[in-house]
Amino acid sequence: MYQTTAALRSAFLEFFRSNGHQVVDSSSLVPGNDPTLLFTNAGMNQFKDVFLGMDKRSYTRATTAQRCVRAGGKHNDLDNVGYTARHHTFFEMLGNFSFGDYFKEDAIRFGWTFLTEVLKLPKERLCVTVYQTDDEAFEIWNKKIGVAAENIIRIGDNKGAPYASDNFWQMGDTGPCGPCTEIFYDHGDHIWGGRPGSPEEDGDRFIEIWNIVFMQYNRQASGEMLPLPKPSVDTGMGIERIAAIMQGVHSNYEIDIFRALIAKAAEIIGVTDLSNKSLRVIADHIRSCAFLVADGVMPSNEGRGYVLRRIIRRAVRHGNKLGATEAFFYKLVPTLIEVMGDAAKGLADTQVIVEKALKAEEEQFARTLERGLGILDSALNELQGDTLDGETVFKLYDTYGFPVDLTADVCRERNIIVDEAGFEVAMAEQRSRAQAAGNFGADYNAALKIDAETAFCGYSELTGNAKVTALYLNGESVSAISAGDDAVVVLDVTPFYAESGGQVGDKGVLVAQGIEFAVSDTQKFGQASGHKGTLTAGSLSVGQVLEAKVDKKLRHRTQLNHSVTHLLHAALRQVLGTHVTQKGSLVDPERLRFDFSHFEAVKPAELKQVEELVNTQIRRNHELKVAEMAIDEAKEKGAMALFGEKYDAQVRVVTMGDFSIELCGGTHVGRTGDIGLFKITSEGGIAAGVRRIEAVTGAAAMAYVAQQQAQLEEAAALLKGDTQSVVAKLKAQLDKMKQLEKDMQQLKDKLAAAASADLAGDAVVVNGVNVLIKKLEGVEAGALRGLQDELKQKLKSAVILLGVAQEGKVNLIAGVSNDLVGKVKAGELVAMVAAQVGGKGGGRPDMAQAGGSQPENLDAALSQVLPWITERLA
C-alpha cells in the first residue's frame, strides 16, 4: 500500500485535501515573483507573497507536490549528486501550508497522523527535533502527541551565529523564516550514524523526512526580523526519502523512479552494472534538465542557462565514462515522462522541444569534450601534489567550456582538490607561490617533457656538486643559456627538494666560477628535478659542473612546518576521531595548511585540545626516525598514507615517538623539539566534509603570539586596565552600551509620541475623515511604525501616509483605521506611492509599508495622495 512514488504522491495530496487543504499545482522551476531565487527550491516559493501579506488567495490551507531544483546559488547540491544516497539536483517536495489558519499544534498533528496512521510507520522508529527555545513545540510533541521527552531533541544555534540552526528555517539571506520541528526516521542500528544533535548525526541511520516550519518572521537585508502579518506554516517532505522508507530501501536511488531511469540508461549505453554511480548521476540529472527545459530554460553561458549547461555536461561525461559513443541523454525523456506520471504533464506537452534541446547541447559538448578531457587528463598526470591549480581550471572553462564543477568531478575521482579560489581570479599561485614568482604558465609542467633522471641527496646534504644534464628555455630544450634568461636547469644529482606531497620546492643558487643561477622553485618533471629560476651572472651550458646550494633558512622553516603536519594529523585523529584523514596540504617556509575530512566545524575547545596535544609532543622532543620498507609492511605498522600520492613498492616511513607514523618522502626536523612552538591561526570549511587548518611554527609562531599579546595590551590600554581585566572591562562596556541603547530607544519613543501630537494637528478633514499626509525630516525609518500607531490612536477615524527620505532611500508607511478599510486599503495606498519613488510594497488593509530608491520623487508622489484618498472617500 502506497509503495510506489506515484501512490505516495496521491495519498499525501488526498490526505490534506480531506483535511480542508486546496490542492495546488506545482509552480514552474523558474520563480515568477522572486528575483532572489535562481530556481524554485522549496514548496513555499510560490506562496512567498502570501506569507509576506502582499498577496491573498481564496484559500488559507494548501497542499502541493512541488518540483524543485537545487544546483546553483546558496542551495547547491551538485557536487554530491550521485555519490551520496540522498543528494539530488531535482526532487519533489510534498508540502502543506497554512496562511494564518492553523499553527503549531495542528501542523504537528497532521504530520504525525499521516506518517503513523496513513503510512503506518512504526512510532518507535521516529524521533523529532525542535528549536532550542521553542518550548511550545516541545510541549505539543510531548503532551499532545505523546512522544517521549527523550525522543524530542532541542537543537540550538551554531556558535556565534544567531538563528544559524538546523531548526531555524530561512529561505535565504532575506525572506520568511522561523523556528521549525523536524521528524526523523531511524533506518536501524545496522547503519552507521547517530541521532540529530549527536556527533554522529551526519551518518545515514537517522534521516530527516519532514520539516515543519513555523513561519513567524520576515528577515530583512539588514538582518532585522520583522513579524509576519499572520503566523503561518510551511512544511516539506522529500518524496524520494519517504518513498525509500516505504519501499524498504536505504538509498533514494533504489526507489522505483530511479530504478527505471537507471535501467533505461544502462540499456541505452549498453552496460550491465546497475550499481555504477555514473548511472545514478545520469538518472538524477535527466530529471532536472528535462523539467528545466520544459519550464523554458535553455543551455547558455549565463544565469539559469549556464547552470543547466553544467548539469547536462556533467551527465554526458558520466555517460562517456560508461562507454557511450553517441548522444544518449535525450533518449531518457520518454521513460522519465512515464515514471513521473501525473507530475510530468507539462513535460509531456513539451517532449519534442525538450529532446531537441538536450540532444543539441549533448552534440555540441561532444565536439569539445574529448579535447578538453585530454588536456585535463594530461594536467592531472603531470600534477605534483594534490591540488589542481586555478589557472588550468580557468583555461578549461574559458577555452573549452568546462564548468569548474565538471573539472572538480574528474579531480574528485582521483582524490585531487580543485583550487577554486585560484579559478575565480584565473591565477596559478593558489597552488604554489613559486609558480607565480616565475614567468612560466601554469600548464608549463604539462608541456615540458624531460627524459632525464635526477638523484636526490637532499635528505642529508644541502650542498653538493652536480652536472647540468639539460637546459630548457621557453619550454624548449637548449644547449646553453645567457645572463638574464629565465630557464629550467636539470642536474644529474641535487640536494634541492622538488615540490611533492604538499611541500614546496626548495630555493637557492647554482654556482660556478663566474656563474650564478638563482633557483626560485624546484619541480618534478617525470623522474627529473627541474630547477626553475634566472641566470643572474655568466653563461651556462649542458655538461658544466655546478655547486648546488639550498637556501638553508628556508629549508629549515619548511621542515618545521612539514614535521608538524604529521603531529597535527595524529592529534586531529585523537581529538576528533579516526574518520579524520588528510585531504591535502601546503607546506612552505611561512606557514602550513592542512586539509582534512570532518563533518562539522571544529569547536574552539577541540582546536585548543589539538594545539595543546601537538605542543606536548614538541616538548617531548621525540627523535624523528626514518626507515625504508615494503609498503605492505608499512601499512601493517599503521603508517598513514598521504592523500592522493602514488607510492612505490618500497616506501619511506617517518615515525615520531609512539604518536605519529606516516608514509612520507618529504624533509623533516631531527627532533620534534626543533619545531619550538605550534600555533593554529585559522580553521574553516573548504568543501563538503573537508575542513582546513592554517598554522605557524617556530619563530613565526612566536611572532604570532607577540602580535596577539600586543593587541591584547592595546585593548587593555584603551579600556584603561591591564591584560588580566580586559574581558571584565569589555563586558562592562557592552552592558553599559546596551543600557544606553535602551535609554535611547525610550527617548525615541517619547519623541515619537510628542511628534505624533504635533503631527496630528496637520491632519485635514475629508468627508468627515482625518487625513494626514506628511514627509518627515530627521525621523529614522524604524520609528515610523510606532509613530503611525500613535497617530491612529489620536486621530481615531483616519487615513495616514508618512514618508521619510534619507541616505538615498525612501521609506513609506500607510495606516487606515478599521472603520475605513472597506473604502481605503493601506496596501493599495502605499503601493501607489512606492511605484512613483522606484519601489514597491504592500501589506494589510489597515497597515502597510514600502520602500523606494528615488527620494527626489517623494514630494511629487505625496502630492497625488490627497486626490487619491478623496476619490475613495467620496
UniProtKB/Swiss-Prot annotation:
The protein's name in its UniProt record: Alanine--tRNA ligase
Ligase among keywords: yes
Domain comment in the entry: Consists of three domains; the N-terminal catalytic domain, the editing domain and the C-terminal C-Ala domain. The editing domain removes incorrectly charged amino acids, while the C-Ala domain, along with tRNA(Ala), serves as a bridge to cooperatively bring together the editing and aminoacylation centers thus stimulating deacylation of misacylated tRNAs.
EC number per UniProt: 6.1.1.7
Cofactors required: Zn(2+)
Record's function text: Catalyzes the attachment of alanine to tRNA(Ala) in a two-step reaction: alanine is first activated by ATP to form Ala-AMP and then transferred to the acceptor end of tRNA(Ala). Also edits incorrectly charged Ser-tRNA(Ala) and Gly-tRNA(Ala) via its editing domain.
Residues annotated as binding Zn(2+): H562, H566, C664, H668
Gene designation: alaS
Primary localization class, coarse: cytoplasm
Cellular component, GO annotation: cytosol
Reactions listed under catalytic activity: tRNA(Ala) + L-alanine + ATP = L-alanyl-tRNA(Ala) + AMP + diphosphate
One biological process term in Gene Ontology: negative regulation of DNA-templated transcription
Family recorded in the similarity comment: Belongs to the class-II aminoacyl-tRNA synthetase family.
Organism, scientific name: Shewanella sp. (strain ANA-3)
UniProt keyword list: Aminoacyl-tRNA synthetase, ATP-binding, Cytoplasm, Ligase, Metal-binding, Nucleotide-binding, Protein biosynthesis, RNA-binding, tRNA-binding, Zinc
